């Protein structure tokens, strides 16, 4: 009797499910008759080409992947909001900073830089920290890293640098012989290499790392006055990194630790927060620095910061592919009141990042919800694959796809014009003057605790000891010696490089 009652309950449950279940369909909306068996010519006959459901499933499966990002391939996204902490309209007319308490929705994508999508998140690497602000002036992307500087200062070296850091085209393995061969002729990398080989190169979580805009940008107010700014996200959770032994332990237990931690904490209601700070310099003050303030390999030392707002991440994406994977960030996505500086690396990124997103996602990438502005879009960009918008907004005539027109009145916003900038000099192709490649690496080294110094030497010598070319190894050690004699001496000992050779190279 008990079994009969159970059977009856199960039968009723199945009947209930079948009544309320949604019908499986093909992409054209037609219902599917059988999703377990292909159509065949008899029990043991061939599968028929007319099985359009089977064909469509296989076709769609073969086309699920889009091109992987050439850098920043492995990423984790989250939604949130930015709240400005004051009225900074005296510095910029950009809307996120113009009214105290204003709330701007954001989407953030954290990432590793060099390694591929399936790589462990424990690997040493800078970490991407890209923030998309959905403002009422359009989307603004602040595309930065967890470290304040970069390896190179000119975008013409970017493809070479990435090639050297990526796996070998022969073995498909990342090889210190390759990237130190490249860096041995790039003394500008000394500062960034010091940063990335500290424990900051292996963060304990995305929540416990800072973010930096790296480059100088321009803020312009309504009077047309220009100031240079650098952006800094400060984690309210504090900065925590993994020491060498911890990296090995964590990788063996969970090589997705950064993503797991972020999503677990957000889903538990422990929303991570970052305060946004800016350093501000007038053009005159920038010109008086004893190093090039537009050099992406430098931080602005001894320039005070001011807090301008707080970001809170409070929602995990509903679908990884639709949001995180298809999110497209580019420094060229700017709004009135913010302009790029003359930083040579930034100038190249303005083109390269936008172009790689067009390659990955197509010309209509801004129609994807995660990239779509919250503000109205009205222009005459048209057609292309997967277009589902006229792009014209609430205009009177869809027949007019040009401007100017007497039939449709599209206006421009004069405050969005490029700020007038004086130019002088001659067209040239030369390195910057006064590069000062080594001194900030020394400042960083001397600021570290003894434990952090020891970990830096351990981390850096571990990769340098894999280099087969003795000259490359000696040159690299000489760069760090020029940054700080103690730094170079300890590194020479850890790598069995002759200190006399190092000092000779350092004096050249």
UniProtKB/Swiss-Prot annotation:
Residues 373-392 have a biased composition (Polar residues). Heme binds at residue 353. GO terms for cellular component: cytoplasm; periplasmic space. Residues 1-21 form the signal peptide. Keywords: Heme, Hydrogen peroxide, Iron, Metal-binding, Oxidoreductase, Periplasm, Peroxidase, Signal. It is an enzyme of class 1 (oxidoreductase). InterPro entries: Catalase, Catalase_AS, Catalase_clade1/3, Catalase_core, Catalase_haem_BS, Catalase_immune_responsive, Catalase_sf. Disulfide bonds: none annotated. Residues 373-396 are annotated as: Disordered. Belongs to the catalase family. This is Catalase. The lineage of its organism: Bacteria, Pseudomonadati, Pseudomonadota, Gammaproteobacteria, Vibrionales.
